[in-house]
Design a protein with these regions (language model features):
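Short, solvent-exposed, Trp/other aromatic-anchored flexible loops in extracytoplasmic proteins
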Residues: 106-156
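Bacterial N-terminal signal peptides that target proteins for export
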Residues: 4-24
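Short, hydrophobic/aromatic beta-strand segments
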Residues: 94-100, 113, 161-163
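Sec/Tat signal peptide C-region and signal peptidase I cleavage site
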Residues: 35-41
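Short, surface-exposed binding/anchoring microloops in extracellular/periplasmic proteins
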Residues: 64-102
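Bacterial N-terminal signal peptides
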Residues: 20-34
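Low-complexity, acidic Ser/Thr/Pro/Gly-rich terminal tails and inter-domain linkers that flank the onset
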Residues: 42-77
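Short beta-strand elements
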Residues: 160-173
């Protein structure tokens, strides 16, 4: 066999070896980039107002990088309506009541009524770092898990809520 044919087969074997060494990690990387791991929200049994109930609990940051806890649950105090509790860190703010929560999604806008004073535990809490809102109207008016923006006058100007959280809220209703 001529020498040039032997050299050619050696080069093609090297190319095949390098091809698989480079191609396999590259294909794995591309599959992770274009098919990201899904983030699933969780509904857990939580103690709220002294009772165990299913609730969605998420920590989100507003555009000022302040962290807020959003707890959504069906309240036995409010005729089993879906309630959204917004909790800030005590000492950082004071939420005056009643204050409606503005919710925006695209061109649509909702104002959720403040239900904080109906909850005796929150009404008597001196820290005043939490507020509760009637989420039923919003959940009944949306048919998709769309991203939302929450605004609470004097507290935060915009708190983005991702679609997976909205999906979790809708599953509670």
């Amino acid at each position: 066999m001529p020498l040039w044919i032997l050299k050619m087969t050696k080069i093609t074997k090297l190319n095949k070896k390098n091809f698989f060494i480079v191609l396999l990690p590259l294909s794995i990387l591309l599959s992770l980039v274009f098919n990201p791991i899904k983030v699933n929200a969780e509904i857990a049994e939580t103690e709220i107002n002294g009772e165990l109930m299913n609730a969605s609990i998420e920590f989100l940051r507003d555009l000022d990088f302040e962290t807020w806890q959003l707890v959504t649950y069906k309240s036995p105090l409010a005729e089993d309506k879906l309630i959204l509790r917004v909790i800030g860190y005590p000492g950082n703010l004071r939420i005056d009541h009643p204050t409606n929560l503005q919710v925006d999604s695209g061109r649509k806008r909702w104002f959720l009524s403040d239900k904080t004073l109906l909850n005796v535990d929150l009404a008597n809490d001196r820290r005043q770092a939490a507020a509760e809102f009637d989420l039923d109207e919003l959940i009944n008016n949306i048919d998709k898990n769309r991203p939302l923006r929450l605004s609470l006058s004097g507290v935060f100007s915009e708190l983005p809520v991702p679609p997976f959280v909205v999906k979790e809220w809708r599953s509670l209703s």
